[in-house]
Amino acid sequence: MDELTQANTLAIDEDLVDSVNSVKGWGILKSLNPSYPDISLVENVITFGRLKDSTVHYNDKSISGSHCKITRESNDDDGVVIAFIYDNSTNGTFIDNIKVGKGSRCLLASGQEISLTPQKQLEKIAYIFQTVEKEIEDGGPSNKYFIGEMLGQGNFATVKLAVERTTGVKYAVKIVDKKKYFMNSSARKDSLMDEVNILRGLSHPNIIQIIEVFENEKVLSLILELVECGELLNDIVSNLFYTEDKAKTLFRQIVDGVLYLHNKGIAHRDLKPENILLKHKNFNQNDAIKLTDFGLSRTVSDGSFMKTMCGTPQYLAPEILTSSGGHNGYGLEVDCWSMGAILYIMLCGYPPFDDSREVSIFEQIRNAKFEFDPEDWSSVSEEAKDLIKRLLCVDPHKRYTCNNIIQHPWFNPNVKLSTLLEEDERLRKKAEAEVEANNNNTNKSNSPKMLGKRKSEDGNCSDSNNNNNSGSKSLSSIKSNTTMLDCDEKSNNNNNNGHKKSKSDPTSNNSLFNNDNNNNNNNNNNNNNNNNNNNNNNNNNNNNNNNNNNNNNNNNNNNNNNNNNNNSNDTTDSDTDDETISLPVITKNSKSMSNLQNHLNNNKINSDDESETSTNNNNNNNNNNNNNNNNNNNNNNNNKPSTINNNFPVPFPKSPTKNSPNASPPIKPQNSSNNNSGLAGIDKPKCQYDPNCYRKNPQHLRDFYHTVSSNK
C-alpha cells in the first residue's frame, strides 16, 4: 500500500471482526456507542424498546416502550438476506439520518446506520447493520472486508465503505446487482465486465484505482480506491463557481487523466462533474482529481466508431445524438466536448445547455447554442472562453483534442491568443478559396456542351496537319453568324489548304436548302469554302471575286427564309474540348419539307464540273482546287447520317466524271402514293439508296419512300 492509502485507516474493534466471523445468526448490529454492546441477529424477529419482553431492552426515556422491530424475510436456500425495520416509536427511528416514520417500514441494506435517537440528543444510540450472507462461503468481500455505511447509490449499483479486516485500510466497494443491471435491455452480456477490464489495465494518479474484484451469481463487487472529499459537482455548488486559477489547476488534472485514457484508445463517454471525485482539498497536488465510473467506457480501436446513445444529456456531444440515425458513429472526441461543458460549469456554476430554455436541450447541443452572459463572464479571460468554444465545437474533426488543450494559450503562456486567431483566419480564407475553386471546377464540368468552335483552333474547324491554312476566322465573325456547321475534327486530306468537312452531313453538303434571291457566286482561291449554301435556288447570281480564304457563306443565310438550324444530331462528333463558343439557336423553319421537295425537283447536277458542286445556276463559280467539299461524298457509306430540323435529306450520288467513271448516275426522286409516314395526301420522294438504304431511323423511313421499307 502507498502512503496515501495507508492514511485512510480506521481503528477496527477486534471484537467486530471476531463477532462477524463467529456469528451464528444471519446478521449483526455493530454499536457506534461504546456504552452499548453489539447485537447478533439470530431470530427472524428482533424487538427494541423499554418493555421488559423486548428482545433488546433499554432504560433510556427517549426510547419508546415498543420502539421498533427488525424482521428477516428471506429464503435460506438462496442465501439472500431480506430484512425490514418497522418504526413504532414516538420520537422516531432513523436510517442514515432519515426518519422512517411511525407505522412505516424500511428495507435494510448492509452498511446502513440505524439510530434509535434523534441527532440532537447528546447520547446517541446507533448501530451499523451488517448481514452475513452466503457470499462469505462463496469468497465474497464480506469475508475479507467489513462492509460499512453507504457512500452513494445508482440505478443498479451502490457504493459503500469497505474496511479491510486485517489491516483496517478503508476502501470503497461498488456492489452491482446483476439482476437489475441486465433488466436494462440495451446491456450486452459481457458489458458488466467492461469497467473491470478497463480499470485493471489502468494506472494513473487522476484515475480511480481498482484493488480487487469479487463475483458470484447475484452481485459483482469492486473494491476501489477510496476518495473521501466527494464529487466535483458538490464542491462547485458549495463555492458557487471556481476562480479561474483554481479551475485551471483542477481542469488540467482532468485533461491529464482523459489524455491517458485516449492514448490507450479508451473513451470514457460519461464525463461529468458527478463522475469526477476529489481525493483531498490540496488542489495543487497532481492527484486531487480522480476520474471514476467507467461503466460506459469503451475501447475504441483505430478506424472504429461507437454508436450507442449513452451518457448524461447536458454533457452529450452532438455526434452521439445522431449516432443512431445511420451515421458513422463517434470516437474519442466525445470526451473533449464533455470537458468543454465541465469547464463552462467550473467557471460560472451552471451548465451551457439547459432544459429550462425555449429551445430543447438536444437542439441546443446540435447547434452548440450557448452564450457567455456578461454578468457571469465579465471577469473570465478571453483565453478561457476561447478554449470553451473550441471544445464545444459541433464538428468533431475541428474540435480541440487533449493535446490541443495543453498547447492552448490558457495553459501555454508562450502562445498568444491573437496569433492563434490570425492562424484561424488564414486557414478559413484558404478553405474558402479551395471550396470556391472546387465549385468552379464542378460548374465547368457540369455545364452543357455548346456547339461552336474551339478557341484553340482560332477559327479553323479542321483538325488538319497542314499548317498552310490561310483562311482563319475571327471570333467576332463566329459570334455574328446565326447558323453554324460544325466541322469534322479529323480530316484525312493533309494538303487541303483549309478544306473543311462538315459534321452535319457525311457528304459535306449542308442540308439547309434556302430560297435565296440574292446569293453571290464567289471566286474563292481557297478550298475552305464549305458550299453550305450551294443548294440554293438562286434567281439573281452576281459574280464576285472574293479572296477571303475562309468564306463559309454562312452569313448569306441571314437573308433567307429563316431555314437555318444549328442543331446537329451527328452521333460521330468526337469533340471533347470544354472551351466552346456559344452561338444563338435558330428556330426550326416550318417550310423545310417544302424547300426540300422544291430543291429535289429543281436541282440539276452538272456532270462535267470536276468540283462536283450541286448548285443550280452557278456556272461562273471558278474554284481553283479540285478537292472541293463535295468530294466528301465518298464518305456516304462510312459515316452515320445526321439530322437537321428533324429532316433527313438524301445526299446526291456522284455523276460519272473523268476522275470517277464508276460513279452511279443520279436517281431522280419518284413520287409514290404509298405514304408510309401516315400523313395522308402527301407524296414522298423515293430514297435514292433503296433497296440498300443505310438510314434506318424512323424519321427517314417516314420522309422517303422505300420499296422494301417493310424489311428495314
From Swiss-Prot:
Its EC number is 2.7.11.1. GO terms for biological process: DNA damage checkpoint signaling; DNA damage response; mitotic DNA damage checkpoint signaling. The active site is at D270. Keywords: ATP-binding, Coiled coil, Kinase, Nucleotide-binding, Serine/threonine-protein kinase, Transferase. Residues 431-695 are annotated as: Disordered. One of its GO terms (molecular function) is protein serine/threonine kinase activity. It holds the Pfam family zf-CCHH. PANTHER family: SERINE/THREONINE-PROTEIN KINASE. This is Probable serine/threonine-protein kinase fhkE. The gene is fhkE.
